[in-house]
Regions:
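N-terminal strand-loop element at the rim of the active site
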Residues: 6-13, 19-20, 26, 30-69, ...
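A conserved mid-protein helix/loop that constitutes part of the nucleotide-sugar donor-binding site
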Residues: 14-22, 193-212
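Short His-centered aromatic/hydrophobic patch
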Residues: 94-100, 118
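A short, active-site helix/loop in glycosyltransferases that binds the activated sugar's phosphate group
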Residues: 139-164, 171-173
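Nucleotide-activated donor-binding/catalytic signature segment of Leloir-type glycosyltransferases, i.e.
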Residues: 231-250
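Short hydrophobic beta-strand element within catalytic cores of glycosyltransferases
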Residues: 285-288
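Conserved acidic donor-binding segment of nucleotide-sugar-dependent glycosyltransferases
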Residues: 300-314, 322-328
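A charged, aromatic-enriched C-terminal amphipathic alpha-helix characteristic of glycosyltransferases
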Residues: 311, 328-359
Length: 361
């Protein structure tokens, strides 16, 4: 198989970036010719080295993430695509929410499969933001992949198709050994948030919980960065520690091993939150909004609290306190939560699913 992958401007250690790098690495290691195009050069250096060691032809626009304009990205991508037409690509696998995938498809020949992968919820609110160019991408793709069953269903509704499918993220975690021990009875609990610090993720709810006397037995730990919440926003908040963003698997593992639970009070529909998948790799329970694809993760009932109305502070607090009580009473199971991850999201499992999908004819 000859596989051409395109992902829009990469961050150093983002979720979509990790998925695409791992797919490219897996394909190359399996003996398939693989090229990876991205419209920035902000990918972490260790990822560049891994890809090149595996034999991936990595092509990056020589500009930092967020600095190149639309014309510059389109022109660079067109030149790269025309050069890549010398190879007959069996699969052209594009990603993201933009119209530039159409340029990469110019590398297709008769018989090439054109796959497009959507990584967010694709709900009605999101659809209102789609450009005409991106709608053409969804309509013209030979195959559509959603990051959750919820997303796949919304893609079908939006396009009038009936063939979008779900495939899980290929991700890896530093947790290759059994998860850490559960907290002892009566111990102060450590609840955390992991991800981009934006207003739709429920950070204001966490700030209220940290100041709430009903939650005095809980410490709060924030791991992430984003424009809506500069570090000083968390200064002098009692029971709360801001750690900044992690930039690699070692920092990610250190963040998770120090937590007892994770929260995600999204007020919008999620595709399938990668932070919760990685939380489950560590065997940690979580509290999250019952929005988008998130309920698809809630298999181990005692380790998952779904909040139906994340805008309702009292409902969020009640869910946190229920999980805290179960943690103190020894009624959560890190082994059960980890088992769900191993069955559905472990790298070996998902790698095999993606390679089977990409190589089918």
């Amino acid at each position: 198989m000859n596989l051409l992958i395109y992902g829009p401007q990469f961050a150093a250690y983002g979720g979509m970036e990790r998925h695409l790098c791992l797919v490219a690495e897996a394909a190359a290691q399996a003996g398939h010719r693989t090229a990876l195009l991205t419209t920035s050069n902000s990918l972490a250096a260790d990822w560049r080295e891994r890809l090149r060691t595996a034999g991936v032809d990595l092509r990056e626009l020589p500009a930092a993430r967020g600095t190149a304009g639309g014309v510059a990205k389109a022109w660079w991508l067109l030149r790269q695509t025309l050069a890549l037409r010398a190879t007959r690509w069996d699969v052209i696998y594009t990603n993201g929410q933009g119209a530039l995938a159409q340029i990469v498809w110019l590398a297709a020949r008769r018989g090439s499969r054109r796959l497009h992968h959507h990584h967010t919820a694709a709900d009605t609110a999101e659809q209102r933001t789609w450009t005409p160019g991106f709608r053409r991408v969804l309509a013209d793709a030979g195959e559509l992949v959603g990051c959750s069953r919820y997303t796949a269903e919304r893609l079908d509704e939006a396009t009038g198709r009936r063939d979008a499918r779900f495939l899980p993220y290929l991700t890896e975690t530093a947790f290759v050994t059994p998860p850490p021990a559960a907290p002892s009875a009566g111990a102060t609990l450590r609840f955390g948030f992991l991800g981009r610090l934006v207003s739709t993720k429920g950070l204001d709810t966490i700030l209220r919980l940290a100041a709430d006397p009903a939650c005095d037995g809980i410490e709060w730990h924030i791991h992430g960065a984003g424009p809506d919440y500069p570090p000083e926003r968390f200064a002098d908040v009692r029971h709360l520690t801001y750690h900044g963003a992690y930039t690699g698997p070692a920092q990610q593992a250190a963040a998770l091993v120090d937590l007892d639970a994770v929260v995600l009070f999204s007020v919008h529909n999620e595709g399938m939150p990668l932070s919760l998948i990685e939380t489950m790799a560590a065997g940690l329970p979580w509290v999250a909004s019952a929005r988008g694809g998130t309920p698809e993760l809630a298999e181990s009932a005692g380790d998952c609290e779904l909040v139906q109305h994340p805008e309702d502070y009292d409902e969020c607090r009640a869910a946190v306190l229920r999980l805290a009580a179960r943690l103190h009473d020894g009624l959560t199971s890190r082994a059960a939560q980890r088992a769900v991850w191993e069955r559905r999201f472990a790298p070996a499992v998902v790698r095999a699913q993606w390679l089977e999908f990409l190589t089918k004819r």
